Amino acid sequence: MKIKWFGQSCFMITSRSGIKVLTDPYKKMLGYKLPEEMEANIVSTSHNHSDHNNINVVKSSFVHINELGNFSEHGIEIKGIQTFHDKTSGSKRGKNTIYNFNIDDINICHCGDLGHVLNSDQIEEIGNVDILLLPVGGSATINAFDAVKVMKQLNPTIVIPMHYRTKALGLVGYIFGKVDKFISASGLKVKEYDELELNKANIKDYSGIVVLKYD
């Protein structure tokens, strides 16, 4: 499996058989830039905000996952779990869907724009997590300290932070916190990669926080 980060909450996850899952593609206004001719088999959108729902960037035919429930597409099991974009049950920013993907026997949890610490029902529904894709920048999502709480609630092998300030965001990025604050609060070891490539047999070799670089 390969995992590449395109900035914000957008990842391309490629299975060993070549199936591509794209999460939360954004519009160009962020300062990040997606490839012009993207191809994916599955595209998930956690909520309907423009920095997470630009499915038109994908030029191939694909299955769009944007609902709650259980799905099976291209040999990948997917589960959508109801959460919120804020701490007030969605009254400020609306709903958010966490998506679980089982790819190559590895459970990946993409938290979208999660705005709160999880409750016991949500933790149970999410279940076992091998790789957690977690917002850490605050402002529109959980901040670094609540992100650590969610990390401890789900106890993944690997945490990949997302939705935080980077140089590529320019002035827009100043509304978010830096990833360093989450790293410091977590107390975990950190590795950096341009792209993460792993499998079920060697996943523990990458345990802790993995920071993926934005090209």
Language-model regions, residue ranges each:
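Binuclear metal-ion centers of metallo-dependent hydrolases, dominated by the metallo-beta-lactamase
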Residues: 4-6, 92-93, 158-215
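Conserved acidic residues
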Residues: 40-41, 130, 157
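Active-site-proximal beta-strand elements of phosphoester/diester hydrolases
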Residues: 2-5, 20-24, 77-84, 98-100, ...
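Active-site-proximal loop/helix segments of hydrolase catalytic cores
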Residues: 88-154
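Short secondary-structure boundary segments
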Residues: 47, 136, 162-164
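Metallo-beta-lactamase
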Residues: 53-97, 101-104, 187-204
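Pre-active-site segment of Zn-dependent metallo-hydrolases
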Residues: 10-62, 66, 82-96, 114-125
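Zn-dependent metallo-beta-lactamase
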Residues: 1-16, 69-81, 200-215
